[in-house]
Amino acid sequence: MALYEHVFLARQDASPQQVEELTAQMTGIVEGLGGKVTKTENWGVRSLTYRMNKNRKAHFVLLNIDAPSAAIAEIERQERISEDVIRYLSVRVEELEEGPSAMMRKADRDRERDDRGGGFRGEREGGFRGDREGGFRGGDRDGGGFRGDRGPRRPREEAETATDGE
């Protein structure tokens, strides 16, 4: 039998229970056709790179499958029919990855960073804001100097002349 990594995206408004039911349904199909699901990972709700079927987020689920190609064809057929599945992808691999996938390792790494307790650092002494302190604050990059063929800048009108029209 062949080894596959199968990922599907479920709608963001599907509850976690519905996603678990979809996963169980896919597992049942594989086992019914003589295969087995060796690993299931729910990556949770993640933002999509672009909108798919009017969804900006989706539940991501990974299945590592050891099954005949007929089982994969049936899973994909069922996912095309299901309204809860936005996208899916099956990739045949030489060997299945042991342990957590790269996405789960990344999630663990991010969780460890959050545990460091960075949080709000409070006010900085003297209001220091990097290289902006005491330097030029906005406007032209050259400070209003030479403007090439555009000629000199006209003086600004005072605020009083702008309100005279009322």
UniProtKB/Swiss-Prot annotation:
GO biological process, one term: translation
Keywords: Ribonucleoprotein, Ribosomal protein, RNA-binding, rRNA-binding
Pfam families membership: Ribosomal_S6 (PF01250)
UniProt cross-references to SUPFAM superfamilies, sorted A to Z: Ribosomal protein S6 (SSF54995)
Disordered: annotated segments: 97-166
Annotated HAMAP family: Ribosomal_bS6
Protein name, entry field: Small ribosomal subunit protein bS6
